[in-house]
Swiss-Prot record:
The gene is RNF146. The lineage of its organism: Eukaryota, Metazoa, Chordata, Craniata, Vertebrata. This is E3 ubiquitin-protein ligase RNF146. Residues 92-168 form the WWE domain. Residues 254-359 are annotated as: Disordered. Pathway: Protein modification; protein ubiquitination. It catalyses: S-ubiquitinyl-[E2 ubiquitin-conjugating enzyme]-L-cysteine + [acceptor protein]-L-lysine = [E2 ubiquitin-conjugating enzyme]-L-cysteine + N(6)-ubiquitinyl-[acceptor protein]-L-lysine.
């Protein structure tokens, strides 16, 4: 009998702690022990199973997923929607936790409602509150939080700016869920985008539309010249005209220095309108259409006197060391009655031939 009693006592000690001693062995099935979390190294609170079959606390998986979407043991990827649709080992345990074991429970503020703390955190808060502490620290999802029991707020220890209200209230108030796990299975609420809050809050982040800012173009805008859009690389018509005038002016100046004796040509003395300079009136070189026609009638006289004019030019150039431009410009010295003139004028005909006439 003594041995039998010893065996009976030994079998009772081998039973799980949650099994009553007066329960019959034949009427109960062997129960599974609560697994331990490999992240927090404690007994799992609301254990969830990953696709790789590893089991962790729900909040531990949530905190680890922010650092990397992989299992903490085998490094297998965690599905994107796992936190919204976790695989609970015991859904009944979640409902039992929401009902609570006492009269009061602790809650933290969420969007459009309150969340109930998990059992472990609720015990820590209740213990600090009963002892009259002003604040206490909580480890939630790998982050240290400070619960200010005077102002009834919580915040991260290294980030005091973001605060969340907390409260101690009766267990039967309406709530959204426990520790980020929803009690309802509404598909519309499950798929809401939630912020990365370690305590399981579901504050919906403001989903603003993708704003596309216009890129600052490195190309200069098109400029308008006389109502026409021109590119900065494309020269304007005025610029091309001024360039042509500049080249013409350079060519004329080169011709003037090379052949000072040919300054009698009419077109070389005309200034471009764009140069902005008003030339002195020179009637001897201003050539009109009537002058050109009268010169064509006197072709024979011009040819006869061509040799005489060249001799006179040579004599005048030899006598003058510094030729006067005003004297050589062919100033009009016409004499009434067909008088002779000592200065000859060289004009350009419309056909491009140069003729020398005496006035």
């Amino acid at each position: 009998m003594m041995a039998g009693c010893g065996e009976i006592d030994h079998s009772i000690n081998m039973l799980p702690t949650n099994r009553k001693a007066n329960e019959s062995c034949s009427n109960t099935a062997p129960s599974l022990t609560v697994p331990e979390c490999a992240i927090c190294l404690q007994t799992c609170v609301h254990p969830v199973s990953l696709p790789c079959k590893h089991v962790f606390c729900y909040l531990c998986v949530k905190g680890a997923s922010w650092l990397g979407k992989r299992c903490a043991l085998c490094r297998q990827e965690i599905p994107e929607d796992f936190l919204d649709k976790p695989t609970l080992l015991s859904p009944e345990e979640l409902k039992a936790a929401s009902r609570g074991n006492g009269e009061y429970a602790w809650y933290y503020e969420g969007r459009n409602g309150w969340w109930q703390y998990d059992e472990r955190t609720s015990r820590e808060l209740e213990d600090a509150f009963s002892k009259g502490k002003k604040n206490t620290e909580m480890l939630i999802a790998g982050f240290l939080y400070v619960a200010d029991l005077e102002n009834m707020v919580q915040y991260r220890r290294n980030e005091h700016g973001r605060r969340r209200k907390i409260k101690r209230d009766i267990i039967d108030i309406p709530k959204k869920g426990v520790a980020g796990l929803r009690l309802d299975c509404d598909a519309n609420t499950v798929n809401l985008a939630r912020e990365s809050s370690a305590d399981g809050a579901d504050s919906v982040s403001a989903q603003s539309g993708a704003s596309v800012q216009p890129l600052v173009s490195s190309v200069r805008p098109l400029t308008s010249v006389d109502g026409q859009l021109t590119s900065p690389a494309t020269p304007s018509p005025d610029a091309s005209t001024s360039l042509e005038d500049s080249f013409a002016h350079l060519q004329l100046s080169g011709d003037n220095t090379a052949e000072r004796s040919h300054r009698g040509e009419g077109e070389e003395d005309h200034e471009s309108p764009s140069s902005g300079r008003v030339p002195a009136p020179d009637t001897s070189i201003e050539e009109t259409e009537s002058d050109a026609s009268s010169d064509s009638e006197d072709v024979s006289a011009v040819v006869a006197q061509h040799s005489l004019t060249q001799q006179r030019l040579l004599v005048s150039n030899a006598n003058q060391t510094v030729p006067d431009r005003s004297d050589r410009s062919g100033t009009d010295r016409s004499v009434a009655g067909g008088g002779t003139v000592s200065v000859s004028v060289r004009s350009r005909r419309p056909d491009g031939q140069c003729t020398v006439t005496e006035v």
